C-alpha cells in the first residue's frame, strides 16, 4: 500500500473570479505537519473533439491564441457550460466551430493538462460519420477549418508545428485507432 501524502486545507482565499477562471490561494498542512501555500486555478472543464473522417484525415482549426500571442492548429474544443454534460459540449463545439455534425461519438480519454496549478479537466471524444450541415462561426471566435491527413498531422507534431497538448493527444489517439489499438 502506498503512503498517504494528502494535504489538508487550513485557509482559502479567492483572488479573482471571472467568467472562465477562478484564482485561489490556499494554505495547506503537509503530511509532515508543516504548512505551504498553494496557488491554483479553478476551471469548469472542457471537451475536445477528434473529428476523424473515413480516410483518416482530421478536421483542425487554425486560430490565434492571445495568451501566447500566436496562431495554433488545434482540434475543436471548448468549455463545458454549467450543468452541461461533456458530450453535449463536444457536439455543440463541433457544429458551432466547424459546421459539422457526427453520427457516431465515443469517449476516448479524460485529461488533466496542468495538475500542478489547475483542476481543469478535458474530455476527449471521437466523432465519426462526419457531415457538413452548417456554417461555422460562434460569436467572438475567428478561425479557419483545415482538413489534414493523419500522417501529415503526425509530421506536424514531429516538426514542432502542432504544439497544443490536448491536440497532440487527440492525434495520437487517431493514430492508435487507425492501427486497430483503440
Task: Pin down the residues of each PLM region.
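Hydrophobic residues on conserved beta-strands that form the core of alpha/beta folds
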Residues: 23-25, 37, 61, 75, ...
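A glycine-rich, hydrophobic loop/mini-helix early in the fold
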Residues: 46-70, 74
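C-terminal boundary of histidine-terminating zinc-finger modules
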Residues: 171
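Conserved hydrophobic/aromatic beta-strand scaffold that supports enzyme active sites
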Residues: 20-27, 60, 124-126, 145-147
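Acidic, metal-coordinating catalytic segment for phosphate/diphosphate chemistry
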Residues: 13-48, 54
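Extreme N-terminal tail/first-helix region
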Residues: 1-17
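Generic C-terminal helix-cap and adjacent flexible tail
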Residues: 176-182
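Unchanged
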Residues: 36, 45-48, 53, 79-165
Amino acid at each position: 500500500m502506498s503512503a498517504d501524502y494528502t494535504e489538508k486545507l487550513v485557509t482559502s482565499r479567492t483572488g479573482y473570479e471571472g467568467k472562465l477562471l477562478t484564482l485561489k490561494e490556499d494554505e495547506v498542512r503537509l503530511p509532515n505537519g508543516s504548512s505551504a501555500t498553494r496557488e491554483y486555478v479553478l476551471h469548469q472543464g472542457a471537451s475536445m473533439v477528434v473529428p476523424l473522417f473515413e480516410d483518416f484525415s482530421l478536421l483542425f482549426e487554425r486560430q490565434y491564441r492571445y495568451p501566447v500571442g500566436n496562431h495554433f492548429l488545434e482540434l475543436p474544443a471548448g468549455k463545458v457550460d454549467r450543468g452541461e454534460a461533456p458530450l453535449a459540449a463536444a457536439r455543440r463545439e463541433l457544429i458551432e466551430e466547424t459546421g459539422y455534425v457526427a453520427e457516431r461519438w465515443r469517449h476516448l480519454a479524460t485529461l488533466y493538462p496542468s495538475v500542478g496549478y489547475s483542476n481543469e479537466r478535458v474530455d476527449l471524444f471521437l466523432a465519426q460519420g462526419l457531415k457538413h450541415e452548417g456554417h461555422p462561426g460562434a460569436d467572438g471566435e475567428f478561425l479557419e477549418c483545415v482538413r489534414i491527413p493523419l500522417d501529415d498531422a503526425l509530421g506536424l507534431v514531429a516538426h514542432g508545428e502542432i504544439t497544443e497538448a490536448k491536440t497532440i493527444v487527440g492525434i495520437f489517439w487517431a493514430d492508435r485507432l487507425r492501427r486497430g489499438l483503440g
